[in-house]
Amino acid sequence: MTTTVEKTFNIFDILIGTEGEEGFGKKPVIIQGMTGSYGSTHTRLMKAYGTNIPAGVTPGKGGQKFEDISVYNTMSEAVEATGAQISGIFVPAPFFLKAAAEAIDSGIKLLVAVPEHIPIRDAIKVLEYARRKGARMIGPNTPGVIVPEVMKVGIMPAQPFKAGTTVVFSRSGTLMYDVSYNLTGKGYGQRLCLGIGGDPINGTNLIEAFELVRDRDDVESIVVVGEIGGDAEEQLAQYIISTNFIKPVIAYIAGRAAPKEKRMGHAGAIVYGNYGSAESKVTNYAKANVPVAKRPAEVPELLAKKLRK
């Protein structure tokens, strides 16, 4: 697993800025594909949550308004008008490569790539191009990212999340909601919740996600929601050990009962032999002193025990 995290890349500064400074929590976000059925629905929901969306991009519809938001033909026009560094991409998969490249060329630093069914070759091209340009991609096939009670970019519902000091990183969208709901119900609010994405190629993998928060004083603990398939969790366990990651970590792994060599839901959720199996992940997490919950409701129980130690 390749990991490249620029130490100068501060996801919180880009998403919300610094508390006390002008514009805190109101960083501008551009929505690509805003006027499509998918993009328009979630633009309304993001705006209602508090996300500052001053512009959207739909080629051929420049000059129009949607929900009192200006529509531009190109990303360069939208970025010039707003100064945005964040893009939420809601275009259909066949248009993703062009849309993402245009965003990066326009100076966008954080791309939230929501669409599923992105060809692996296209995802790799965007990932490599983003790294060369000093940008970061979340996704593809991600529910997005949310700073609870401040802003969100993506498709997640608002109800499960509450502000706090726990971070949730998840390979599954719905399980990110479920785990966060259980954490909230037991009084463990979230500082950040980020969907890694369910595809084999991740713009920001688990190790890179951990690096984004490891030195932050406002992050007390991390919950990582994994699933069968691939070796992301095994690599993460080794990272926790080798870098002496000291923040408390709790894990949940979906798909424990899944049959081997059968894809379950996500393109990345497939087990070959013992490679990518739940047993392999649990074993490696145990070596890293990471408790693994058997169900989402058990996550806050394990977190409480971990924090008491």
Feature names for model-found ranges:
Residues 2-309:
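Catalytic-core regions of core metabolic enzymes
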